[in-house]
Amino acid sequence: MKKGTRKVVRITTLVLITALIGVTLYFNLSSDTQIVEAGDDYIDFELETLDGDIVKVSDLLENQGVILNFWGTWCKPCQEEMPDINELYNEFDREVEVVAVNVRESNQQINQFLNSLPEEMDFTIALDRERDVTRAYNVGPMPTTIAINQDGTVVKKQESQLSREDIVAFIESAQE
């Protein structure tokens, strides 16, 4: 290759790499997605439920605190903690609202998962098909559970399976 051709190839490669870095930075830094952590105000959302209704956090917060539990059908810890969440939800006379947010799975997968559990779940199953809510609440591993008190403050977040003691702590935090 001639010296002049090599120089053109190097400059073109450098320009392309710089452009790719610029585009990547632009899309990552210009995102208007808010990420919520403990201590922040909640981000409101509307999601369709497995029953075909719409659930909206702000409507639920009018009467009580809310616990969001993000889960997937493939998640063994999710399967293990759900019956405990349901049992304690009922033991506490539903003093907080529990919304189990499934991430990107079909109704068939969800129903098959729920049917494999030892009992029927009494709380709301919401469907985050586009992962908008999952991203807004900065959910990484599943299960992830978030407690929001009635004032609309995220008071607790855990990115792992909840023990029965953890579930009680989440319910009590959401009641503050």
Language-model features and meaning:
Residues M1-E46, E176:
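N-terminal targeting signals for export/organelle localization
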Residues D44, Q64, E95, D122-F123:
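A generic structural signal for alpha->beta connector loops
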Residues D44-V66:
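A short beta-strand-turn-helix
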Residues L50, V57, V101, A126-D128:
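Conserved beta-strand termini and adjacent loop/short-helix elements that scaffold enzyme active sites
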Residues Q64-V66, W71-W74, P141:
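Short pre-active-site segment immediately N-terminal to redox-active cysteine/selenocysteine motifs
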Residues I67-L68, V98, T145:
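Hydrophobic beta-strand anchors of alpha/beta hydrolase catalytic cores
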Residues Q79-L117, R129-A136:
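Structural microenvironment flanking redox-active thiols in thiol-disulfide oxidoreductases
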Residues N115-M121, D128-Q175:
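Thiol/disulfide oxidoreductase modules built on the thioredoxin-like
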